[in-house]
Amino acid sequence: MPRLKTVLGSLGLAALLLAPPLSAEDGGRWLERMAQAVKEQSYHGSYVYERTGMFTTQDIWRQVDTSGSRERLLQTAGRHQEWLRHDGRLVCTTSSDLKRSRSPGRSSAPLIDSQQLADVYSMKVYGETRIATRPVTVVAVQPRDGFRYAHELYIDNETGLMLKSLLVDDKRELLERFQFAAISFDAPDYQAGLEPSSVCQEVIITDIPAATDVSFLEPAWLPPGFSLSHRDVQTMRDSEALITSQVYSDGLASFTLFIEPLVGDSLAEDLRAQLGPTVAVSRRMVTADSLFLATVVGEVPPRTAERIAESLEQTMAEAAR
């Protein structure tokens, strides 16, 4: 499918982005508020997600209290799709392939350190507008290098929750749009839809034996500002093979490195694919006694993902010495 060619100017945003900032206020403070709201805010809303000319609409219910967080997503058009998460862990879905997992680290919303973020992004506040009838502040986040994309964030003035985001490449092509059409912070609204439907399949999480030998492969190169935020070990349905995943983030952008063992006659090949902002780069890796597939998936430019994947060969060479 052809890439969406819409540029920021045709979205009516050119004047906003090209004009000087309306405020000298540090955009980093708004990003810190946004990160805090992701962890603490309860709400119910309906939003539109767009990438590469394709649209999906979803409802979300999210409740955060002293016992943790619960979140349910429901696709409202097309095939029924549903996801339920407790404390960030997927516990129910209509398309589950997971069989079991062991998590050496706890997944959580990224902590945004505005000073560290300023090393790799420039952040500017560009005034106010409205999203879903609510006043929001617009923060433009521009990368200082070519290893990540630009963001335009519309942050709710009252709660700090992000109500709209645009992801833009270095040619100012729109890669992704996320936008709430309606949102409520009233308890009866967000509590009403937290129970899964009858077709939502439980994701069975059982412990992989602690004695199981699990090796995580670290890339020899990471883009500046990225660091490891989470590790996990999984097996897929009808397979006992262990698949490791490692999530890296710079506070805004993130990518995941998957390592999957292969058998000798596996048809898996090197590949590069992209859908909107999401890129996937796979490399077959061979050691003296094993064969596996390393895949980098994330919302980073293709050249970034390729360099990360290529650096794994250096990691393996150093380990073999």
What are these regions (language model features)?
Residues E40-S46, S67-R72, T133-A140, L161-K164, ...:
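Short, hydrophobic/aromatic-rich segments at coil-to-beta transitions
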Residues E202-D289, V300-R303, R307:
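Short, solvent-exposed recognition patches
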Residues V38-E40, R62-E71, L84-R89, R134, ...:
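Short, solvent-exposed coil/turn segments at beta-strand boundaries
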Residues P104-H151:
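Intrinsically disordered, low-complexity linker/loop segments enriched in Gly/Pro
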Residues A132-S198, R272-L275:
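Gly/Pro-enriched, hydrophobic low-complexity segments
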Residues P2-S69, G78-R79, Q116-A118, E128-T129, ...:
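N-terminal leader/targeting segments and the immediate start of mature chains
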Residues D59-Q63, G127, H151-I155, F178-A181, ...:
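Hydrophobic/aromatic beta-strand elements that line small-molecule binding cavities or substrate pockets
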Residues T52, T56-P110, K164-A181, F185-D186, ...:
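An acidic-aromatic
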